[in-house]
Amino acid sequence: MSPCENDTPINWKRNLIVAWLGCFLTGAAFSLVMPFLPLYVEQLGVTGHSALNMWSGIVFSITFLFSAIASPFWGGLADRKGRKLMLLRSALGMGIVMVLMGLAQNIWQFLILRALLGLLGGFVPNANALIATQVPRNKSGWALGTLSTGGVSGALLGPMAGGLLADSYGLRPVFFITASVLILCFFVTLFCIREKFQPVSKKEMLHMREVVTSLKKPKLVLSLFVTTLIIQVATGSIAPILTLYVRELAGNVSNVAFISGMIASVPGVAALLSAPRLGKLGDRIGPEKILITALIFSVLLLIPMSYVQTPLQLGILRFLLGAADGALLPAVQTLLVYNSSNQIAGRIFSYNQSFRDIGNVTGPLMGAAISANYGFRAVFLVTAGVVLFNAVYSWNSLRRRRIPQVSN
């Protein structure tokens, strides 16, 4: 038992702060290595433009693929053994893998370790499940929206810090620095997260069919999983072509990398500002209204992105898009809280993470395929169509639902 654990009531606000810090640290740790991932692949012996592109894409995607496979297993274990234990497992496991990545000698070793990183991940969905089971239901939107800003903040700062560290110390040391960040996350979680959890035996655990029958509205929950997948597909579809699109808009300028970095970052900044506020508004008017409104707003912003003429115009539209995006996943998570019990929260959030990871893999593939055949601008129009479908699909799934009265 950690020093922070005793018989006093759990302070969910303190747990939220600590979980936010954990999500920030893991978000930063994951993104620290992203700016130089292709360079590290090259350092491990991969040569040639096409081979380098192929291997960079594979080592990037395989983490999400294996995370999608492993998430339901870890979610079930969280419902049996507790969410805090899963947070500790994830932080420590990823820290050890990062050390091994820094010691990798060839591309195959690195590929296996990237897959292992996906298998051992799961800090964020378990943090969501922990907070969702402790926070008063009428504050779920605000709490989950606030928690989401932790990972976003880390993901924003990570690439910049990773690039600076790689330039200063070389590529391999960054993996060791990343590992130390994850070990710090482990100790922060160990000593400052509190959870009162009664372990459940394997025989007492609900099986998959019982999980489905225990849901208030299983079809609605499945539709929320699909919504999460489509949100990530839409977000990821733009990632492969953003820098090239900015270069096309900017023309002959020397600082296209800096401009691209700024335009890539502004949605995250906007999401930081909007997520807690829109989450709080969702607690008042209903998260389903926030979800549908944000999806429609996203469609109205994606269409003009296809017609912009300058990087500034694109940057402004992406900032506004980020404000809408900041509301989407927290709204989905809040609806999942409303429609499932604490007993199965770990599995529900892990299933949702699996759909999110599948979206993370398929989104960039879709964007790259569309741009290769129809050009950069077509990506935004197709993505707008995908999001519009998501809005109609979500509205149809949610229209008969009435928000239950929630109280402290």
From Swiss-Prot:
Location of this chain's protein in the cell: Cell inner membrane
Membrane topology: Multi-pass membrane protein
PROSITE patterns: MFS
Source taxon at top rank: Bacteria
InterPro entries, per the entry: MFS, MFS_dom, MFS_MdtG_subfamily, MFS_trans_sf, Mutidrug-R_MdtG, Tet-R_TetA/multi-R_MdtG-like
GO molecular function terms attached to this record: transmembrane transporter activity
Keywords linked to the UniProt accession: Antibiotic resistance, Cell inner membrane, Cell membrane, Membrane, Transmembrane, Transmembrane helix, Transport
One GO cellular component term: plasma membrane
GO biological-process terms attached to the record: response to antibiotic
Annotated TM spans: 16-36, 58-78, 92-112, 115-135, 146-166, 173-193, 224-244, 256-276, 290-310, 378-398
Database matches in NCBIfam families: PRK09874.1
Free-text function comment from the UniProt entry: Confers resistance to fosfomycin and deoxycholate.
Similarity-based family: Belongs to the major facilitator superfamily. DHA1 family. MdtG (TC 2.A.1.2.20) subfamily.
UniProt-recorded name of the protein: Multidrug resistance protein MdtG
The encoding gene: mdtG
